[in-house]
């Protein structure tokens, strides 16, 4: 089975927010999250609940629970067969806050817009 590419979203300054979020986690939690990312690369969009779930449209969440804390990474698959990791966060409740969804949507749009070919000008 061919592995899927998994990439960290980069903002306009070249910052990788999910990578920065991972750096702030304990070694134990980071290892578990990285293992889950590897599972996503292995299975691609076929990886489903309880490991991932759909948020809305193409936006999905990678799910991991460690102790009482839920860790999430919002991501989507772009047209080049790459999983793009958009936003990482932890939470204590079962729902994803609208503010986190908004960040995920904005970063997904920014990624798609950056990758879209420039429109040819009419002469």
Please name every model-derived segment.
Residues 1-70, 79-83, 90-123:
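Basic, Lys/Arg-enriched alpha-helical interface segments
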């Amino acid at each position: 089975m061919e592995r899927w590419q998994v990439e960290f979203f980069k903002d306009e300054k070249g910052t990788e927010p999910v990578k920065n979020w991972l750096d702030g986690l304990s070694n134990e939690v980071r290892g578990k999250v990285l293992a889950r990312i590897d599972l996503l690369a292995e299975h691609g969009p076929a990886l489903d609940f309880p490991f991932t779930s759909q948020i809305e449209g193409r936006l999905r969440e990678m799910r991991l629970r460690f102790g009482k804390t839920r860790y999430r990474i919002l991501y989507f698959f772009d047209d080049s067969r790459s999983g793009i990791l958009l936003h990482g966060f932890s939470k204590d409740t079962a729902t994803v806050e609208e503010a986190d969804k908004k960040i995920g949507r904005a970063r997904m749009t920014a990624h798609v817009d950056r990758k879209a070919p420039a429109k040819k000008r009419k002469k």
